[in-house]
Amino acid sequence: MLKGPLKGCLNMSKKVIVIAGTTGVGKSQLSIQLAQKFNGEVINSDSMQVYKDIPIITNKHPLQEREGIPHHVMNHVDWSEEYYSHRFETECMNAIEDIHRRGKIPIVVGGTHYYLQTLFNKRVDTKSSERKLTRKQLDILESTDPDVIYNTLVKCDPDIATKYHPNDYRRVQRMLEIYYKTGKKPSETFNEQKITLKFDTLFLWLYSKPEPLFQRLDDRVDDMLERGALQEIKQLYEYYSQNKFTPEQCENGVWQVIGFKEFLPWLTGKTDDNTVKLEDCIERMKTRTRQYAKRQVKWIKKMLIPDIKGDIYLLDATDLSQWDTNASQRAIAISNDFISNRPIKQERAPKALEELLSKGETTMKKLDDWTHYTCNVCRNADGKNVVAIGEKYWKIHLGSRRHKSNLKRNTRQADFEKWKINKKETVE
């Protein structure tokens, strides 16, 4: 079991509650219950719910179910705009400060979990003490040869260099740029800032086991269609057609909403056999929703939990008939201790779900494994030996079809060379 709260936040007197979890698990419902109990207001952290209108396909919590609780950073971005994480950070910080100023508790809720990473984890500040780069430094940073940049980083900060593949050009370049601009090794900076939060933050993870969750998600898609989701998708398509968008332009912005791209072939009628069944589009929407939920769980376990050193409380929303006991009352008890500055008496996770946090602990240990493994058998397209970072990826490489094929080829070549030598000796 993971122990110990996350230390080092910048403002211990100001509280923030974060509710993480997959789509359709009940985050909005829980946020209303906590807001009512603790005089809170909700801040949306879902990248699709920031867009105006289309409340059904973006799954905005219905106004009539919000119990008068104010919601911030929601329903304010035009469809023509792309919404970036730096804008979310600005808007979310403004909302948090406003809510705190009025003596209330901000409750951050949403499915775009990387927003939480951007908001709560302190990042490297290169501007406060930024140095002017020399011509030589600029030449190195602008080099198109990954080896030049990587080898320079190895000399300047070997610890941070081990965390990146030599061909990970952009990240290696960024680390070297930080070193040049601050005069400080990025590895030292990251170690100092790794567990710093901007506020005293309680992380709650609302979780449901996959099978019942997926059934609820399928049912939700059916319910959305009954409530008018198809009309909203057609509304989006009308805007899409009027502005002459193409499918290739639908990788960003409002077009990422689940439902639009799944129904686009049906709306355009453009397929190989010119026939698209509405039922197939509905099934694709359900499939993509389930896939999205899987990615969200993976992100929480592999990114969020390691970032906050396991300082998170898991709530079981698997059985909705037990919602009040397993989710609502447990969340209220945890939040009450947190807000009152008392030690939290509740366990991090119910016994049946402890393994989820244990896996997060394993991930944290694995994240510290930055050993470089060089394969003497396999080479990249540029002729260099393949490099794997960390034991996990080394084992994956060793078990890959590519490695096994190269190993067999080398063995056959070695056997052939041995045969030639033996034959030559026999003849002589």
Curated annotation (Swiss-Prot):
Its EC number is 2.5.1.75. GO terms for cellular component: cytosol; mitochondrion; nucleolus; nucleus. GO terms for molecular function: ATP binding; tRNA binding; tRNA dimethylallyltransferase activity; zinc ion binding. The core aggregation region, although lacking the prion-typical Gln/Asn (Q/N)-rich domain, is required for the formation of the amyloid-like fibrillar aggregates. Residues 199-207 are annotated as: Core aggregation region. GO terms for biological process: tRNA modification. InterPro entries: Dimethylallyltransferase, IPP_transferase_euk, IPT, P-loop_NTPase. Residues 46-49, 170-174, 256-258, 284-302 are annotated as: Interaction with substrate tRNA. [MOD+] is the prion form of MOD5. [MOD+] is the result of a conformational change of the cellular MOD5 protein that becomes self-propagating and infectious. This conformational change generates a form of MOD5 that assembles into amyloid-like fibrillar aggregates. [MOD+]-aggregates sequester soluble MOD5, resulting in decreased levels of (i(6)A)-modified tRNAs and higher ergosterol levels, due to less competition for ERG20, which uses the same substrate DMAPP than MOD5. [MOD+] can be cured by GdnHCl and by deletion of the molecular chaperone HSP104, which is required for [MOD+] propagation. Present with 2020 molecules/cell in log phase SD medium. Zn(2+) binds at C375, C378, H397, H403. It is an enzyme of class 2 (transferase). Residues 210-232 are annotated as: Interaction with isopentenylpyrophosphate transferase. A zinc finger (Matrin-type) spans 373-409. Catalyzes the transfer of a dimethylallyl group onto the adenine at position 37 in the anticodon loop on a specific subset of tRNAs both in the cytosol and the mitochondrion, leading to the formation of N6-(dimethylallyl)adenosine (i(6)A). This modification optimizes the codon:anticodon fit in the ribosome and promotes translational fidelity. Competes with the farnesyl pyrophosphate synthase ERG20 for the common substrate dimethylallyl diphosphate (DMAPP). The record marks T112, Q193 as: Interaction with substrate tRNA. ATP binds at G21, T22, T23, G24, V25, G26, K27, S28. The keyword Transcription regulation does not apply. This is tRNA dimethylallyltransferase. Keywords: Amyloid, ATP-binding, Cytoplasm, Metal-binding, Mitochondrion, Nucleotide-binding, Nucleus, Prion, Transferase, tRNA processing, Zinc, Zinc-finger. Dimethylallyl diphosphate binds at T23, G24, V25, G26, K27, S28. It catalyses: adenosine(37) in tRNA + dimethylallyl diphosphate = N(6)-dimethylallyladenosine(37) in tRNA + diphosphate. The keyword Thylakoid does not apply. Belongs to the IPP transferase family. Pfam families: IPPT (PF01715).
